[in-house]
Design a protein with these regions (language model features):
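Exposed low-complexity, polar/acidic, P/S/T/G-rich flexible segments that act as propeptides
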Residues: 2-11
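Asp-box/BNR beta-propeller blade signature and adjacent active/binding-site loops
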Residues: 15-383
């Protein structure tokens, strides 16, 4: 049989025949599924590409259920050396197990963020560790103070062999937390190495009035010490950071006011912030984590300066996971530079990386698998 014509409201519509060669088949890989390695769920993706081209994906391993800390949670890592086609057996960069007389379910560590020091290829992972606190949500049961019995701890691990093995946990709480804050943790996803070698992670903290605020922390000495300055915007949480030009950082934030992303700029590592023209206007969101990366002109096949963004492209519900591109520094995100990957409902978190000069990689919480990976050609997004 053959389709001869199509009528819409009584009028004949123009039909264009397409060859099978014109159809783009974009396959996805289920990196983590419920039940893998005995874990009930996997959440909170982070993704980077090492200097050697290795893909390193991090996430929460939530053994008992999908709920947030406090629970039995470790930071897991999956490693791919073939562009995301296959993934090695899961590693655990951060895992406390039974500690200080309390079971693993009272020593959860999660919401990871991962960073590649591009000058040394040292890989850093930062996460929140909660000791005790019953089984209440750590967001509300962490308190002011500094020691592990009162407040969540900010811990790191590093790898110097391309993500194969990891150091013991490094506790940096004393370096960056204000004792009056209830909770300090990273912005899940990824951090960056600036053009001058400074390492930067996004952060979020609940202040003394119980209001959450996004910001950054940074290291000038290859990760030995870390500093924080001021918040970027009040009532914001999970954020991602990029360097849009030398010394200029953009922070893209989940905003509890709902509806759209907040965006701020700093030229002094977070001492002062200014609102970006796109803030609360250009990028809609359902109040959810999102991903943002900067791809310099010399680092991509199009020879253009590009910002890439991904999130659930909606204001209600976590669905329609979409990658968007901006060619003007994030001022506009044109419809022709958007690609929807998954219209189904899921948890909605995602993280982007460049696999090579031609290909975007995304690890996200899809409607089909807890951790789903897809590779997307840059030219499919920006034609």
């Amino acid at each position: 049989s053959e389709l001869q014509s199509v009528k819409i409201d009584g009028k004949e519509a123009v039909c264009k025949e397409r060859s099978p060669k014109d159809i783009i088949h974009r396959m996805a890989v289920g990196v983590r599924h419920a039940g893998d390695d005995g874990s009930a769920s996997f959440r909170i993706p982070g993704l980077v590409t090492s200097n050697k081209g290795t893909l390193l994906g991090v996430y929460d391993v939530r053994y008992n259920s999908s709920v947030d800390l406090q629970e039995y949670v470790d930071v897991g890592l999956s490693r791919s050396t073939d562009g995301g086609k296959t993934w090695e057996k899961m590693r655990l960069p951060l895992s406390f197990g039974e500690y200080d007389g309390l079971p693993a379910a009272q020593n959860g560590v999660g919401d990871p963020s991962i960073l590649v020091d591009t000058q040394t290829n040292t890989i850093w992972v930062v996460a929140a560790w909660t000791h005790g606190m019953g089984n209440q949500r750590a967001w509300w049961s962490s308190h002011p103070g500094m020691d592990m019995y009162k407040t969540a701890q900010l811990v790191m691990a590093k790898s110097t062999d391309d993500g194969k093995t990891w150091s013991k946990p490094i506790n940096i709480t004393d370096q960056v937390k204000d004792p009056s804050w209830y909770f300090l943790l990273q912005g899940p996803g990824r951090g960056i190495t600036m053009s001058d070698g400074t390492l930067v992670f996004p952060t979020q903290f609940i202040d003394s009035t119980r209001i959450p605020n996004a910001g950054i922390m940074y290291s000038k000495d290859r990760g030995k010490t870390w500093k924080m300055h001021n918040l970027a915007r009040t009532n914001t949480t999970e954020a991602q950071v990029v360097e849009i030009e030398p010394g200029v950082l953009m922070l893209n934030m989940r905003d509890n006011r709902g509806g759209s992303r907040a965006v701020a700029i700093t030229k002094d590592l977070g001492k002062t912030w200014t609102e970006h023209p796109s803030s609360r206007k250009a990028l809609q969101e359902p109040v959810c984590m999102a991903s943002l990366i900067h791809v310099g002109a010399k680092d991509n096949v199009l020879d253009k300066d590009i910002l890439l963004f991904s999130n659930p492209n909606t204001t209600k519900g976590r669905n329609h996971i979409t990658i968007k591109a901006s060619l003007d520094g994030g001022v506009t995100w044109l419809p022709e530079h958007q690609l929807m990957l998954d219209e189904g409902e899921g948890w909605g978190y995602s993280c982007l990386t460049m696999i090579d000069r031609e290909t975007i990689g995304i690890l996200y919480e899809s409607s089909a698998a807890h951790m789903t990976f897809q590779a997307v050609k840059l030219k499919d997004l920006i034609r």
